[in-house]
């Protein structure tokens, strides 16, 4: 497996891999990453579809990319996906996945046309004082010292950040700035999360720094991700004859590890409560989704809280990874990520408006008609003075194909589930859907005498508790996550957010899909490059632009410095003023 860039490799079709007709594949899970791997197995690996098996412990595919209407409960989306135009693997695959809505076009075509016609932008990124604009006004609010802290992290070697927290590298000024408000709520970072991952994010998305305040850097699907992404992939795979095995838990995978060679030998299954075993040869490839950010998720209801379940059940992704990791040090250290759910949980809720009474409060903040079919909030609106640090969003409506006319379906989440609310004096984790809606309505500016009635009769709110949703953000070191294909591995790979691949960042659709592509390309030795992570961190134009944007447009020549430094800088500027370098510095407002 090797990385490539440019359209020479991107547009090429690889030859059929040697002996692929003799091989079979077994994939743990049916989340985005497993579906991606399966798609690459049949598209580029040209493996027979009937040789590809996906094991799903539940009755519905999709993993974390959900979007369902549960009978008697209502619409539920555990999360949302923020996409980027440089998700290179994602678009490499979705150009080949047919739309299930429009004949003759791909999922990428649909997505591209939609976001060209209706580009995303937020008209109100944050509120405070019960629905008033917080007037962050597109500013980061960083001093030169704060900017230097961020720059220092950007250039710090990875090994110096192992097991360090964000509070080890940022001081109170940065953590109290608009920059951190935008960043932590957009990506769900907590102050105690990994400084290494924070650095990787800065480098990965340096080209989007200017788009953080108004979220114009983001792209969104038309509907929820289950209907817009997962269902087209399922249909594509079913068209190849790929086999889905539902209600099938993978309870263990047994390996032979000796003399530098590692081989998966047996898959242990629990199929409808009956134990089964699949014996493996070197031609049987196993793709393992280890861990899982939505494991142990629990769904509440309008009148019921979502329970906090921290037990690692058999067949659970964490239990499976622990059993696998015990067999070889190269298989990672799951305990680094799943041992403290108080540090890794947060809650979300799906709000469905049932009549028109809440709509004006939404419209007052987003400054758009929510029923227009176009962008509504343009990404999350963060409630800056919320005790739960609530953020909420309404994407293009309808969010579900079967959504009744006149209803809106939105999503909110709170980073602090253990803190009493501002209006509802209970921790978010103890609240029913109605109570969470009441807290949200309070922050929208609904008059207090009307709040309970609106929450009860004008909305249906379904809470979800996710104990391990940010487990991958916990401080880590090299080796805590296994490589996608560990050294010496013969017939297996690790997939998803808890597999290690260079330069990309977790908690993104792209990271999952990238590990799926890398796994397939490595094990089948496919003769085509995997698109490298977008290289903006090496592009001097993006670096110059980000440096000025972080300073809210102030040129770097305006930095506070001693007179001798300013004198020397002036001399340098004079020398380069009429050169290409000088023009570049002027174009990006460095001078």
Show which residues each predicted segment covers.
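Rossmann-like flavin
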Residues: 100-207, 219-220
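Glycine-rich FAD pyrophosphate-binding loop
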Residues: 42-70
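C-terminal segments that line or cap access tunnels to active or ligand-binding sites in enzymes
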Residues: 207-219, 283-285, 294-515, 521-535
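Conserved FAD-binding subdomain of flavin-dependent enzymes
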Residues: 72-113
């Amino acid at each position: 497996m090797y990385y490539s860039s440019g359209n020479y490799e991107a547009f090429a079709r690889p030859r059929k891999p040697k002996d692929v007709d003799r091989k079979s594949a077994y994939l743990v899970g049916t989340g985005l990453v497993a579906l991606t791997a399966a798609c690459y197995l049949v598209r580029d690996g040209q493996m027979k579809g009937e040789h590809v098996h996906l094991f799903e412990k539940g009755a519905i595919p999709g993993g974390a990319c959900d979007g369902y209407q549960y009978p008697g409960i209502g619409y539920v989306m555990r999360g949302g996906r923020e996409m980027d135009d440089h998700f290179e693997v994602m678009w490499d695959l979705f150009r080949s996945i047919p739309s299930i809505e429009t004949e003759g076009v791909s999922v990428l075509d649909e997505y591209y046309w939609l976001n060209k016609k209706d580009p995303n932008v937020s008209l109100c990124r944050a509120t405070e004082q019960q629905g008033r604009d917080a007037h962050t006004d597109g500013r980061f609010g960083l001093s030169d010292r704060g900017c230097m802290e961020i720059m220092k992290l950007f250039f710090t070697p990875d090994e110096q950040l192992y097991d360090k927290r964000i509070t080890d590298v940022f001081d109170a000024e940065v953590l109290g700035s608009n920059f951190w408000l935008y960043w932590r709520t957009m990506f769900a970072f907590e102050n105690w999360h990994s400084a290494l991952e924070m650095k990787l994010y800065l480098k990965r998305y340096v080209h989007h720094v200017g788009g953080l305040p108004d979220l114009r850097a983001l792209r969104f699907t038309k509907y929820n991700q289950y209907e817009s992404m997962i269902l087209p992939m399922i249909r594509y795979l079913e068209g190849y004859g790929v086999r889905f095995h539902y209600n099938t838990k993978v309870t263990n995978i047994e390996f032979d590890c000796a003399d530098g060679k590692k081989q998966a030998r047996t898959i242990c299954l629990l199929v409808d409560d009956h134990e089964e075993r699949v014996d493996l040869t070197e031609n049987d490839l196993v793709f393992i989704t280890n861990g899982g950010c939505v494991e142990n998720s629990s769904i509440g209801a309008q009148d019921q809280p979502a329970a906090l379940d921290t037990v690692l059940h058999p067949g659970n992704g964490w239990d499976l990874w622990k059993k696998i990791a015990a067999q070889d040090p190269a298989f990672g250290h799951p305990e680094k990520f799943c041992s403290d759910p108080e540090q890794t949980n947060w809650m979300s809720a799906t709000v469905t408006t049932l009549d028109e009474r809440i709509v004006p409060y939404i419209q007052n903040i987003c400054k758009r008609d929510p029923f227009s079919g176009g962008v509504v909030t343009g990404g999350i609106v963060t409630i800056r003075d919320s005790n739960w640090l609530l953020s909420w969003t309404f994407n293009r409506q309808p969010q579900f194909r079967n959504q009744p006319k006149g209803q809106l379906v939105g999503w909110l989440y709170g980073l602090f589930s253990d803190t009493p609310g501002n209006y509802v004096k209970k921790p978010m984790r103890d609240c029913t859907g109605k109570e969470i809606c009441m807290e949200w309505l309070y922050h929208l500016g609904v008059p207090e005498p009307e709040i309970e009635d609106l929450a009860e009769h004008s909305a249906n709110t379904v809470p979800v508790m996710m104990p391990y949703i940010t487990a991958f953000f916990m401080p880590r070191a090299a080796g805590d996550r296994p490589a996608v294909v560990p050294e010496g591995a013969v017939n297996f790979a690790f997939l998803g957010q808890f597999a290690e691949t260079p330069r990309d960042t977790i908690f993104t659709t792209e990271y999952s899909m990238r590990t799926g592509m890398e796994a397939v390309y490595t094990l089948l030795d496919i003769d085509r490059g995997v698109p490298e992570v977008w290289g903006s961190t090496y592009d001097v134009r993006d670096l110059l632009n980000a440096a000025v944007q972080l300073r809210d447009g102030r040129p770097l020549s305006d930095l506070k410095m001693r007179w001798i430094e300013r004198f020397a800088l002036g001399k340098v500027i004079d020398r380069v003023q009429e050169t290409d370098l000088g023009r570049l510095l002027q174009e990006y407002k460095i001078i």
